[in-house]
């Protein structure tokens, strides 16, 4: 199973927390100390928790479960969209719509509308409309693409959430908790780890750190999915070649 090392985390700046005056006392067990009024995360505590989270993700993926990636802050958007796409998982990289989980029935209707508009754009329907009507539909489609494009193939509620920054994504975490959906999340020194099933203490702002978290989770999912494929009728162990390549790329 893919795993991370202390060196990986140091290079990515995982150990740099927030300013000491913004700390959350519940993160005290995971803080090594402070430097220049910045809390330093104890990576010896982070390492096993990070790998535990990867193990949980790998287990879910090996049972063909769905993990929804959530990262709407600017530093996380690109990595979340790219890595979720790479491992075939749904994602939310722009604003979290209230009720995205707890009001799934309404979200499903929006997905249907989005698919209808996509079909119209592809089959030439837009070309038969007036310029004004075609423009209005394209704008509607673009708006839906931003808000729900990453979950259009989710098919139903996810089996788990993987979240970058629990404070920024507090509504998503609350909805998951309400529905009993497990939450895997990166938790910085200014945040509260309560309510997170598998949390990774670390920097949730630096792009390199976010890329490390999201890339490692994607690798764990890919390996889990490939394991599931080998267990299916007609499965072939050749699928493990790609995981080795992914691991080399990460290193």
Curated annotation (Swiss-Prot):
SUPFAM superfamilies: Ribosomal protein S2. Pfam families: Ribosomal_S2. It comes from the Bacteria. Belongs to the universal ribosomal protein uS2 family. The keyword Ribonucleoprotein applies. This is Small ribosomal subunit protein uS2. Transmembrane segments: none annotated. It comes from Arthrospira platensis (Spirulina platensis). GO terms for cellular component: cytosolic small ribosomal subunit. The gene is rpsB. GO terms for biological process: translation. InterPro entries: Ribosomal_uS2, Ribosomal_uS2_bac/mit/plastid, Ribosomal_uS2_CS, Ribosomal_uS2_flav_dom_sf.
């Amino acid at each position: 199973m893919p795993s991370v090392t202390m060196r990986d985390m140091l290079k990515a700046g995982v150990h740099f927390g927030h300013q000491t005056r913004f700390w959350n006392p519940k993160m005290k067990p995971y803080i090594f100390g402070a430097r220049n009024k910045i809390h330093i995360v104890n990576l010896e505590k982070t390492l096993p928790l990070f790998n535990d989270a990867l193990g949980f993700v790998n287990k879910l993926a090996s049972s063909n479960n769905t993990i929804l990636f959530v990262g709407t802050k600017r530093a996380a958007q690109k990595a979340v969209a790219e890595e979720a796409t790479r491992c075939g998982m749904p994602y939310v990289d722009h604003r979290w719509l209230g009720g995205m989980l707890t009001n799934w029935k309404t979200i499903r209707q929006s997905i249907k509308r989005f698919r209808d508009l996509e079909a119209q754009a592809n089959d030439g329907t837009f070309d038969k409309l007036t310029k004004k009507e075609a423009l209005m539909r394209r704008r509607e489609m673009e708006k839906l693409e931003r808000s729900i494009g990453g979950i259009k193939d989710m098919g139903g509620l996810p089996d788990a959430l993987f979240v970058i920054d629990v404070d920024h994504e507090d509504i998503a975490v609350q909805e998951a908790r309400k529905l009993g959906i497990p939450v895997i999340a990166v938790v910085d020194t200014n945040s509260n780890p309560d309510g997170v099933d598998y949390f990774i203490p670390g920097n949730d702002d630096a792009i390199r750190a976010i890329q490390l978290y999201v890339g490692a989770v994607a690798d764990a999912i890919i390996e889990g999915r490939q394991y599931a494929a080998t267990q299916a009728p007609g499965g072939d162990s050749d699928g493990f070649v790609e995981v080795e390549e992914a691991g080399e790329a990460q290193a």
